[in-house]
Amino acid sequence: MKEFMIIKNFGPIENIEIELKKINIFIGEQGVGKSTIAKLYSCMQDIFLHFLILFDSNQKKIKMIFKRYGIHSYFKDDTYIEFHTISDFIVKYEKGKFKISHLEYDEEKMKIFIINLLGDSLEHSFNGAGLSRDSNFKDLPDKEKEIVVSNMRTSFYLPAERSLVGCASNSLYSIITAKVPLPKMLLEYLSFFEKAKNEYQEYEVPFLGLKFKASKDDDKILIGDKEIEFKYSSSGIQSIVPMLMIVDYCLNQDYFSSFALEEPEINLFPTNQLELIRFIISKINQEKGIENLIITTHSPYILSILNVSILAGKIMEMKPELTDDITTILKPEFHLSSSEIEVFSLGKQINGGTECESIIDSSTGMIKGNYLDAVSSIISTDFNKLNRLYIKILREQ
């Protein structure tokens, strides 16, 4: 079964219905609900949410899962949410209550399925936290409870605020243990960067030509023969290095099967955006553990990057005999199949609601050219008008 989600009257979202694929891109201006959709999706696929719906009727406790993502206040009296999972579960929120059903299982079979799934996840989570499986969850300190619960989830959120991590890379443990009042998503991000640093004392980012070196005193960045403190490196480096380390760590530990990335373009020059997106595509193609990726962005440039990968994959499928020609232009690890990507454009309607539409051309499987050209067309039009005015001035002199 394909994943799809219906959202009505939740935060800035009035009424949308979307079918989700392996890679899902949401593009639009600020405040139209891109992050709301990504965060809601992360919550709705949470095994722990499914468990609570089945075994706990306390709706306030269930909604605490949404508080982690800062969207708990988005629920309204007429909010309606419906989420269909790949494994045939249907999670609904209607008239102030969550419900869960299955296309084949009755309630008893659902409980058995979720308990078994949760049990495997719990054991893996205990091991990841360095705890004995015999430990009683209720007796664990709050910090260890938080680690266990976060490791049990299937989705990991990479927030836009991630660039703040670089400024405090050598104070992460203190920030986490001191319970500094930061958003839970950011604290979790900090926690996983701390784990990643312990795992990778040195970490290379080939497409940036640098190496990260973890240290108890001051983390370092090595670029060629030049070494600088990580906290004094560029904002782009501070944003991208922890993110890549965390993703690699999570994949190696088999923690999450789904990732949501906010604004990959943050603090990055276009060529670095290109390298980052292609790095992410290669991870998706190489790692069997990644089942789903959501990206929110403001950048049409990122769509152009993706379109090149889709086109390469399309030509490869149509004419395998042209493999050598295609791979000379773009390596196979950067190719995408149009069947595994969906791109949605979000915008504000006249009445203030959010409009969400697919911008994949159904006939070609590629991102619609008129959408990609829209921004450059506006810029070109303005430039041409100014250029004509400039030429007129020159002629009058």
Task: Spell out what each predicted region is.
Residues 1-43, 47:
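Pre-Walker A-like glycine/lysine-rich segment at the N-terminus of P-loop NTPase domains
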Residues 8-12, 239-242, 272:
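N-terminal pre-P-loop "Q-motif" helix
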Residues 19, 45-260, 332-397:
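Phosphate-coordinating catalytic segments in nucleotide- and nucleic-acid-processing enzymes
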Residues 21-23, 256, 291:
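Pre-Walker A (Motif I) flank of P-loop NTPase domains
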Residues 24-27, 260, 294:
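Short hydrophobic/aromatic beta-strand immediately N-terminal to the Walker A/P-loop
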Residues 43-45, 50, 267-356:
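Active-site/pore-lining binding-face segments in mid-to-C-terminal subdomains
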Residues 262-264:
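Walker B catalytic acidic pair
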